[in-house]
Amino acid sequence: MELTGVTSQSIFDDNAADLKLSWVAGLEGADRAFDVEFAREATSAADLVGHLNLIHPNRIQVLGKPEITYYQRLDDETRKRQMGELILLEPPFLVIADGMEPPPDLELRCTRSSTPLFTTPVSSAAVIDHLRLYLSRISAPRVTMHGVFLDILGMGVLIMGESGLGKSELGLELISRGHGLVADDAVDFVRLGPDFIEGRCPPLLQNLLEVRGLGLLDIKTIFGETAVRRKMKIKLVVQLVRRNDGEFERLPLDSQYLDVLGLPIHMVKIQVAAGRNLAVLVEAAVRNTILRLRGIDTLRDFMDRQRAAMQADAVSRGQGRLL
């Protein structure tokens, strides 16, 4: 996993409010980060944070009530040895959860070694879940793509095409028909799971749509709160192409896909020409995609019917010749 620039300070700043964190020791270790080799070999955020574990000392160590109780039962020599081994390998930081007070000797050792020590009243399980989700988000593969990203009938749809084809105008018409804007011009996509890519709008462009001749439109102000969305999962790409595009296939037999962060996203191509109602075509493409996701393929059904009709006709002709 890629965690460049992620430090104890940045994790604390991003999660202090949600987890009610207090920094009680090791302030000098604010720049401490994950071991580079350890982070590279981690397959998921579950490898980066967990309950106290001396076998995996390089991860974020969370100590709840059971761990503190266990620690307090140890004799002084065992405490010193085990914590010494843990601190020596420089975990990013330690978290004392469940509202427990940090043992004085552990707090002193963290201070001397510049190991950040946080406390929180939140349960240890909740802390681990929250930090795993946080680390998954900041380390996830991401890309910025050009287009208009919309919520159409509950489906995340990215409208793409070369400049001047009317992507923003089409987006504006779809918004006026009750659909929602996620982002215009630049869309930030993050792969958060094996089959889950989330799209968001960069903060600078939030709620804005640029239309030639009109300039920047604040969609939230013009159409209201329900006309914008914070994020959506991408499920469909609509590629606008010019009428004279020789590569356009009228009835594609095989589904078309666009690779986004290593995940194939279903794509349809729509020709742009005078008199064509693109908004209706996009809505129809979305409805058809919903049917495909449910296992209903209209083109395949038609081909099966055609094949059955041809076979029946061939049988009928053969029987006629026999007579």
From Swiss-Prot:
InterPro entries: HPr(Ser)_kin/Pase, Hpr_kin/Pase_C, Hpr_kin/Pase_Hpr_N, P-loop_NTPase, Ser_kin/Pase_Hpr-like_N_sf. Catalyzes the ATP- as well as the pyrophosphate-dependent phosphorylation of a specific serine residue in HPr, a phosphocarrier protein of the phosphoenolpyruvate-dependent sugar phosphotransferase system (PTS). HprK/P also catalyzes the pyrophosphate-producing, inorganic phosphate-dependent dephosphorylation (phosphorolysis) of seryl-phosphorylated HPr (P-Ser-HPr). The Walker A ATP-binding motif also binds Pi and PPi. NCBIfam families: hpr-ser. ATP binds at G161, E162, S163, G164, L165, G166, K167, S168. It is an enzyme of class 2 (transferase). One of its GO terms (molecular function) is ATP binding. The active site is at H146, K167, D185, R250. CDD domains: HprK_C. This is HPr kinase/phosphorylase. Homohexamer.
